[in-house]
């Protein structure tokens, strides 16, 4: 761009170099570094070819300074999980462009309790402790920097910082043709394809479209199996657990052996989350939601925590599978040592599925007849094998989250952070139908 009577040429080089990975010195301010022309030779040559006049005039000033980046290039702001009273506003890459909005939102957050705008994409709690790993930071920030002017297509999966965490059945699912994406720190199934298939990213429908279409039809007309390790799970216990849940959630709490959809609101009545509550009937409750919101939800839960209430993130302990489709009841009825097939819609309970002790909910994000079957991490491989072997005679096939997301949209199941944000009220999303207006005080 023009810079007074000259031209300013900016470069994001592929051969980037990290600096101060342990943190910048406290006395560092606006200092510049010695130029390293050899490192940007390819990029500057392209610039000279694009603007031939630059080849004749020479370089007046070299500017080599530090940039601050997060793994996805967005700022890191807000209250830091696990550190009460500690706030941050870091990784503001474009200070002049973003600084005003970051400052405004942070001030509103501190004074009013929440920012006016939806700032989840900049919230420090969009990451978990896995992102504190220096190698993860090095890979992901380097990837973002080097791709600053590279087209990233919808649903394109990038390699940096992964694979990091995998469900126990990962290898068996890979052998079955699973193509993987990443959800927070976890590898999740996107779809299942023939050996050798490679997706070509596109601004239109990619060459994986027909594969995902087949998976949708399979679940609609028959039966499908989905790894739901990519759901979050929180356990709530204690003598005041029910009272606490009744305050934190706007819905009516489920009776023992039942589950319920539960909107969670901010003090101003805006949507804080859409989750499911399970009452297992033994004094323990589960909250289930989106896996990538684990730190975000836990921060809110701990902000509201009360005496006599314990809450635990089960994300490292539990995983599971979802059976969905009109034939799912036939399969599960032949495997359970209980009346799991008689569970009413939104019912839940503890059942033995083959050799595996499970916690089952009769619901499905796909919108079809379905069962969410939760198990301990150590039972994941065995549970998959049991379900596939028994489901074979019914034509069972595995499917991925691309199909699940498509089916939930067709069913009009919107979710927080995708279709809905913290700028929405329950009335704007249709979730007001789950609010219990007659119960006592709630947030």
Task: Kindly label every feature range from the protein language model.
Residues 1, 76, 274-276:
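Short, surface-exposed charged micro-motifs
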Residues 1-14:
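Glycine-rich, aromatic-lined ligand/substrate-binding cores of catalytic
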Residues 4, 18-19, 25-165:
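C-terminal catalytic lobe of FAD-dependent flavoproteins
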Residues 4-6, 72-74, 83-84, 368-370, ...:
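Active-site lining segments that contact anionic ligands and/or coordinate catalytic metals
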Residues 8, 76, 85-88, 286, ...:
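General beta-strand recognition
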Residues 11-12, 20-21, 420:
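Short conserved micro-motifs at the rims of enzyme active sites and ligand-binding pockets
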Residues 117-443:
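Glycine/proline-enriched, intrinsically flexible loops and inter-domain linkers
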């Amino acid at each position: 761009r023009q810079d007074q009577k000259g031209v300013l040429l900016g470069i994001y080089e592929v051969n980037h170099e990290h600096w101060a990975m342990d943190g910048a010195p406290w006395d560092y301010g606006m200092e510049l570094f010695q130029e390293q022309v050899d490192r940007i030779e390819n990029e500057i040559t392209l610039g000279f070819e694009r603007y031939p006049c630059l080849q004749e005039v020479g370089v007046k000033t070299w500017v080599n300074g530090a940039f601050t980046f997060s793994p996805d290039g967005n700022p890191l702001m807000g209250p830091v999980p696990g550190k009460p009273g500690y706030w941050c506003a870091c990784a503001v890459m474009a200070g002049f462009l973003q600084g005003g909005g970051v400052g405004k939102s942070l001030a509103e957050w501190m004074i009013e309790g929440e920012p006016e705008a939806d700032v989840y994409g900049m919230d420090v709690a969009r990451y978990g402790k896995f992102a504190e790993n220096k190698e993860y930071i090095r890979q992901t920030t380097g990837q973002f920097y080097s791709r600053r002017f590279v087209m990233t297509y919808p649903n394109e999966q990038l390699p940096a910082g992964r694979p990091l965490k995998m469900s126990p059945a990962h290898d068996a699912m890979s052998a079955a043709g699973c193509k993987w994406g990443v959800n927070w720190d976890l590898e999740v199934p996107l779809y299942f394809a023939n050996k050798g298939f490679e997706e070509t990213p596109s601004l239109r429908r990619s060459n994986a479209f027909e594969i995902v279409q087949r998976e949708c039809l399979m679940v609609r007309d028959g039966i499908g199996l989905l790894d739901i390790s990519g759901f979050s799970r929180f356990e709530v216990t204690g003598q005041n657990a029910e009272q606490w849940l009744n305050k934190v959630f706007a819905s009516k709490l489920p009776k023992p052996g039942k589950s319920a959809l539960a909107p969670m609101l901010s003090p101003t009545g805006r949507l804080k989350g859409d989750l499911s509550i399970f009452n297992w009937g033994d004094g323990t409750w589960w909250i289930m939601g989106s896996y990538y919101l684990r730190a975000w939800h836990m921060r809110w839960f701990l902000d509201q925590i009360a005496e006599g209430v314990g809450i635990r993130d089960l994300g490292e302990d539990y995983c599971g599978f979802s059976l969905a489709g009109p034939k799912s009841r036939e399969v599960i009825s032949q495997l359970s040592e209980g009346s799991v097939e008689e569970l009413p819609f939104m019912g839940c309970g503890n059942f033995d599925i083959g050799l595996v002790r499970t916690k089952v909910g009769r619901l499905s994000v796909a919108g079809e007849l379905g069962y969410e079957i939760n198990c301990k991490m150590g039972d994941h491989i065995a549970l998959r094998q049991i379900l596939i072997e028994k489901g074979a005679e019914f034509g069972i096939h595995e499917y991925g989250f691309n199909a699940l997301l498509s089916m939930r949209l067709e069913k009009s199941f919107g979710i927080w952070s995708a279709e809905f944000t913290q700028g929405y009220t329950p009335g704007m999303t249709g979730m007001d139908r789950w609010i219990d207006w007659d119960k006592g005080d709630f947030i």
